[in-house]
Amino acid sequence: MKNLMRTVTLFLFTITGVFAQLPEPGFTIDGSTAIVITDPQNDFLSPDGVAWGAVGQSVQENNTIENLETIFKLSEQYNIPVFISPHYYYEHDHVWKFEGTLEKLMHNISMFDRGDQLNVEGFEGSGADWLPRYKKYIEKDRVVVTSPHKVFGSESNDLALQLRKQGVDKVILAGMSGNLCAESHMRELVENGFEVAVVGDATASAKLPGLDGDQAAQTNYKMISSRVFTTDELVKELKMHPVR
C-alpha cells in the first residue's frame, strides 16, 4: 500500500511539473498573418446589450473594449488584414427544433436578432450592430465581414474560405465571447491548419454563479494556440518586428 501511494504521489508530481512547464511554440507575425475578430457587437459589448449582465464584469476587468480598438488601430498602422466573423440570428433561425443551453438563451433574449439576410430594417443601433466606436474601422473596404456563424464556431460560415483565398496562414484572434465563439473559432482554425495566436485580454466571457467563462477560456487559449498575447505585448511585438 505504501508503495502504491508513493507511485501515485510521484505520478501526480510528475504530471503537475509537466503542465507547469508547457512549451512555448511562439508566433511570428508576417505577411501571411491576419486578424480575426469575433462578435464585436452591441449585445456583448454595450452596457445596453442583452448579454451585458453576464459578460460585463469580464469586459471591464480585461479592458476588452479598449483593447479591441487598439487591435483595430494596429491593423491599420501595420496594414494587417482584418476579418470580422459576426453572429446574426434571422427569423428562420427561431424555428430550430432543438438547441443547446446557450443557443436557447440567446434566442430567448433575442440576441443578435435580424429580420433576414437582406433585411436591414431596425439593424442600425440594434444589439446585432457593431459597437459604435468600431464602425469607423470595420466599415472600410480593407475589412472582410464574413457570413455569420450560427452557433459558436466558424464551421457554419465562410471564414476559412475567405482567409485561404487571401493567402492567410496565420491568425491573431480576438473578440467575444471568449469561452464560446472566440474559443470555438480558435479550435476550428487550428483543426483547419491555421497557426493561431490569441490576444487574451481582447476577449471576455460570462461570469455566473459557480461559472467563470474567462478563466476557462484563458486556460484553453494557453493549451491550444501557439501563443497568447496581451494587447500590450502585441503592440511591443509589432514595434520590434514590423510586418514585412
Regions found by a protein language model. Give the residues of each.
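Active-site-adjacent betaalpha module
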Residues: 20-34, 43, 61, 74-78, ...
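Hydrophobic h-region of N-terminal signal peptides that target proteins for export
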Residues: 11-19
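Acidic/histidine-rich helix-loop elements
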Residues: 45-61
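Sec-dependent signal peptide recognition
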Residues: 2-10
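Short hydrophobic beta-strand that contains or immediately precedes a catalytic carboxylate
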Residues: 36-38
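Von Willebrand factor
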Residues: 67-94
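Short active-site-proximal "capping" loops at secondary-structure junctions
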Residues: 41-43, 50-52, 82, 88-90
